[in-house]
C-alpha cells in the first residue's frame, strides 16, 4: 500500500452522531458505524482517527477529500507509514505506491525495490506516539485469549506463555519470551508492533507457535528460534539485528532459526502454501555480531538445520538477508546429518553481496537439496540485481 492513500471511509459527511475514535488495525478490514450509518471497511496500518460527523470534521492520520463515489461527495483519506503487506495476500513489498524510506536501497529501512521499504528502525516496533504504561501482570501467562497492549514488560526471568491465543501489541519487552510448547502444543502467541531486547546466550523468542508482525528484535543468540514441538512459526515485516555476543567461547549466532519438527505443521504462507513450519516473509534478517576472540560468531541470517527432526515445510519469501563475512553462509536450507528437509521454498529474496561479493564467508546458501520433494529456489538475487543460480548440487554458488 501507499504511504499516503491507503484507504477511505466513505459517507461520513452525510451522517450524524457523536465524535468517534476509529482505530484501524494493520492489515485488517474494519467496518465502522457512526450513529447507525455504516461507513466503509478499509485496509490501513496503525491509524487512529477522530471523526466528528455532525460538524463534518476529521482529525488524526486522515483528511477529507472529494470522492464522487461517496455519499455526499466526500470521503476520509488515510495517511501514514507504508504497509509492507506482511498480513496480506502478496506477502509484503508495499507494491501499491511509493513509500518514504530511510537509508540506502536494500538495507534495513531502505527501499525494497517493490514500492515499499525494508523493515528497519523507521517502520517496526512500537508506533510513534504510543503511550506505554508498566505491565503489572504475571510473567507466567496462563489465561487463554489474553490481550496485552501498550505496555513496558520487564520480567526478571522469562515472559513465559502457558496459554493459547495470547496477543501482545504495541509494547516494549525487555527479556526473553518463551512459548512453552514442550508442555503443551496448544499454547500460542501473536505479537504485533513490538520491540524486544534480551541479553544472554538464549534466543529472544522461542520455542514456537508464534506469529510476529512488525517487530524490532535485538539481542540473544537468535531473534526467533523454533523447535521440535512447534506447529507454526511466522515472522513478517520485521527487523532482527544486533545479536548478543560473548567476548570468548564457541558461540553460534543467527537471525532466525528452525531446528526440526516432531509434530505436524499447521502454518500457512501468504502464497497459500499450507502445512508450513517456518514462515519468514518480507523481513530484514541481519546477523551482524562480530567474531569473538575464540572464533565464535554468526552461523547465518536464516538457518534451517534439521537436528531434532525433519523440516517438512518452510516459506522464505521477499526477505533481505544481510551480508557478513564473519558468517559461514547467509542461509542454511534445512539439511543436517540427522534429518532432511522437504517443501523448502526460497522465493524473491535479496542477498546483500557484502565486501567479498558472496554474502557469507563461503557463499549465500548451503544445505539446500533439489532432490528433496517440493524444494524450490526461484528468483533469489543479490542486491546488485544479479541472479543467484542454484544447480542440483547441495550448494548454490
Located regions from the model:
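Ser/Thr/Gly/Pro-rich low-complexity, disordered linker/stalk segments of secreted
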Residues: 82-114
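N-terminal Lys/Arg-rich, disordered targeting/topogenic segments
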Residues: 1-16, 281
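Extracellular beta-strand/beta-solenoid scaffold signature
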Residues: 133-136, 155-158, 174-186, 193-207, ...
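Extracytoplasmic
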Residues: 13-25, 35-85
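N-terminal carbohydrate-binding/catalytic regions of secreted carbohydrate-active enzymes
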Residues: 112-201
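Right-handed parallel beta-helix
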Residues: 145-152, 165-175, 185-198, 208-221, ...
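Extracellular secreted precursors and ectodomains with disulfide-bonded cysteine-rich loops/domains
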Residues: 99-100, 115, 137, 263, ...
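Leucine-rich solenoid repeat scaffolds
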Residues: 350-397
